[in-house]
Amino acid sequence: MTDGPLIVQSDKTLLLDVDHVLSTECRRAIAPFAELERSPEHIHTYRLTNLGLWNARAAGHDAEQVIDTLIKYSRYAVPHSLLVDVAETMSRYGRLRLEADPVHGLILVTTDTGVLEEVIRAKKIQPLLGARIDKETIAVLPSQRGQIKQSLLRLGWPAEDFAGYVDGQAHEIALKQEDWKIRPYQELAAEGFWHGGSGVVVLPCGAGKTIVGAAAMAHAKATTLILVTNTIAARQWREELLKRTTLNEDEIGEYSGAKKEIRPVTIATYQVMTKKKNGVYAHLDLFDSYDWGLIIYDEVHLLPAPIFRFTADIQSRRRLGLTATLVREDGMEGEVFSLIGPKRFDVPWKEIEAQGYIAPAECIEVRVNLTEAERLSYATAEPEERYRYCATTRTKRNVVEELVAHHAGEQILVIGQYIDQLDDLSETLGVPLIKGDTPQKERERLFAAFRTGEVTCLVVSKVANF
């Protein structure tokens, strides 16, 4: 036993004692390979996952580094079975490689013939393959580049993709750093993506992911398709690109419900891309309608499933995913890894906060109790309904009212998930509410009023995160 800040458990959870003198150092050390699940006041819970370990491997970390880190900071002996599992899992990444071939177009190459024998016997892999070239190499149908990466990941053998990319149609784009300067971590993020070819950059909210996208575009110097969550985000991207790059208004198009402009830089919304007409996704051909050199997926953790299917067919295009989290509600993190690419850059928000680039955040957990009536309902409710009882308890509303009153005059956002609860809070507090059915112009007006201080308190649903 040592006096480390970390408790490593055999179920792959890591418990970090945030009050320990080495907690910040430990947090920074485990961030490349462990995923934060919960961060209450005293103990933060992280988890080791296959994808997290493979992302770390893709970023250049090896199993020895991960194991040494766990042992160094662990308060108790690290379970041997977990150490073996970490080493075995990380060794799986890169044993298979996709490469371009002048004769066959695309080939799958291995450093371990046993692994290749295993995967070519898999029923879902066989239709994607061509002729066996030698004991270490087999041809892959070029049109199945995305599909085979998905299938190999599901088998537990994530392939490294070295097959290269098309340049796309050239278009001059440069950063215009006259009255601003790119931050060091933004530059590192763009360079990390570019050297990796395709992949995901993870940065906290407010850290300037749009600037990373602009820097990637300056690297590519090619036509670019940018996919965003909604029209507000599209217009924010447009404003930032006009301000930060040499692009002018005629070079940037908006492809949304309101407009259908295709320009050298086109910003499209997920909503319009996934809109069906007569049962067909009528707008997905935008991916193929232009010789894009770069495709940027903003808030990639929200990427709709239909776009994954089309992304599988455009693996020869450079793809950049931007997000504050790799966790998806639908559990499709593996699709992001295989089709967009592995994590190329990640920096903890605490580091950026310490450098003064984002406002300091003080997180405080306030625990509340259910009322007697709610306790009875909770006890008899179905398991899937119990979370809602806790989330919408009347006691929580009382606490919100007290907090808003205590911070009167400050800029306050009240964020929630359940619309009926938010409707009630909006009415009780006498403040505006932004939710899914709030018209676009009204959203923009309220956000603008909040930014200027005209409105000091807003109640918002999850749409505020889009």
Region annotations inferred by a language model:
Residues 195-217:
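Walker A/P-loop
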Residues 293-294, 299-364:
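Post-DEXD/H (motif II) to motif III coupling segment of the RecA-like Helicase ATP-binding lobe
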Residues 378-417, 423-424:
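Conserved interdomain hinge at the start of the Helicase C-terminal
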Residues 1-169:
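Extended alpha-helical interface modules used as scaffolds for assembling large macromolecular complexes
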Residues 251-254, 260, 413-415, 420-424, ...:
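Conserved helicase ATPase core of P-loop NTP-dependent helicases/translocases
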Residues 167-202:
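Conserved pre-motif I regulatory segment
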Residues 231-258:
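Conserved helix-turn-beta segment of the N-terminal RecA-like "Helicase ATP-binding" lobe
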Residues 256-294, 305-310:
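Conserved helix/coil segment N-terminal to the catalytic DExD/H
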